[in-house]
């Protein structure tokens, strides 16, 4: 590196730079993109620049005969990341729709997603919801919560909307159940796939 004269920064750009990059592509293709479409696109593809580039290429091909990209277009063609599927799962837990919860879970298993990772993401999601709900109860607005947690306003709004379906006591109880099942699965006292199913059946049944 010293001989070449400078180091290259391969870190992921921030959201502002990614937005500029992607919007330039949209504009170059002669399209527009709604804010809610961009929010959903970013949520589904922000794990890497390669993934984002590939998903945008796919999206632009899908809307080749349209003037703009809508939320419905993104939902129709862009692949969901695992954490987005887990959010959907929890939405169905909130509405007590156990068949949908189990359908989503088995879909993730079919793509070789490890049950322990799914359980970890469920725990992470409820942890976030608990912290956000607590901050909101102290009078903090979405922007303040987003700044303190280092995440996007859009994510805070989505999580707070979902968190309204649970009391603080329910979230605490669910996290205790999840932590217990996680420990039992990791020590071999219960099958890891069954651990997630037991948690979902208890809370969505």
Describe the residue ranges of each PLM region.
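Conserved beta/loop motifs at nucleotide-recognition and modification sites
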Residues: 1-205
């Amino acid at each position: 590196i010293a001989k070449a004269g400078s180091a290259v920064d391969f870190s992921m750009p921030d959201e502002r730079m990614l937005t500029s990059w992607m919007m330039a592509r949209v504009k170059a293709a002669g399209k527009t993109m709604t804010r809610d479409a961009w929010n959903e696109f970013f949520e589904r593809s922000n794990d890497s620049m390669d993934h984002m580039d590939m998903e945008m290429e796919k999206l632009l091909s899908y809307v080749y005969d349209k003037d703009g990209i809508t939320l419905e277009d993104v939902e129709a063609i862009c692949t969901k990341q695992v954490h987005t599927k887990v959010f959907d799962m929890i939405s169905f837990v909130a509405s007590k729709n156990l068949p949908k919860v189990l359908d989503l879970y088995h879909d993730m298993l079919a793509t070789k997603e490890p049950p322990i990772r799914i359980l970890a993401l469920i725990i992470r999601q409820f942890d976030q919801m608990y912290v956000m709900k607590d901050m909101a109860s102290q009078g903090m607005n979405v922007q303040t919560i987003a700044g303190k947690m280092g995440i996007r306003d859009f994510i805070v709004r989505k999580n707070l909307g979902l968190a309204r379906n649970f009391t603080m006591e329910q979230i605490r109880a669910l996290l205790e159940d999840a932590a217990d099942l996680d420990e039992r699965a990791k020590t071999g006292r219960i099958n890891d796939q069954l651990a997630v199913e037991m948690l979902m059946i208890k809370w969505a049944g």
